[in-house]
């Protein structure tokens, strides 16, 4: 599994609860740009429309060698999941008021996949706790060295 794009803010801003691996509909120039490691998931989120999942604000910059056949960098991308997985996600999202966020984009068996999470947003004090735990862990690791 080769990770192409990562969302570093996902663990910081959300309590990650349940993950799903989804396929994604891309154009050729988008695949080429992603294989070069270009792309950003920082502001990306998943929304539901007509019982289908879509990924919005996943920016992939234009591929330099594509010429006039290039893609729009802010295009909405469709996610591919089984029907029962989509129903599960929609039900949990509505019942528990969860967000659906992407955490990483990767290659698996020659196909590009997106790892999405059902997540609950953290409050400000939760973020502070996360920072405190991280600094304590770093200090302990520094002492053992």
From Swiss-Prot:
Subcellular compartments: Cytoplasm
Presence of keyword S-adenosyl-L-methionine: no
Stored Pfam families: SmpB
One GO cellular component term: cytosol
One BP term from GO: trans-translation
Main subcellular location of this protein, as a coarse class: cytoplasm
Gene3D superfamilies membership: 2.40.280.10
Keywords noted in UniProt: Cytoplasm, RNA-binding
Function (record text): Required for rescue of stalled ribosomes mediated by trans-translation. Binds to transfer-messenger RNA (tmRNA), required for stable association of tmRNA with ribosomes. tmRNA and SmpB together mimic tRNA shape, replacing the anticodon stem-loop with SmpB. tmRNA is encoded by the ssrA gene; the 2 termini fold to resemble tRNA(Ala) and it encodes a 'tag peptide', a short internal open reading frame. During trans-translation Ala-aminoacylated tmRNA acts like a tRNA, entering the A-site of stalled ribosomes, displacing the stalled mRNA.
Entry similarity comment: Belongs to the SmpB family.
Annotated protein name in UniProt: SsrA-binding protein
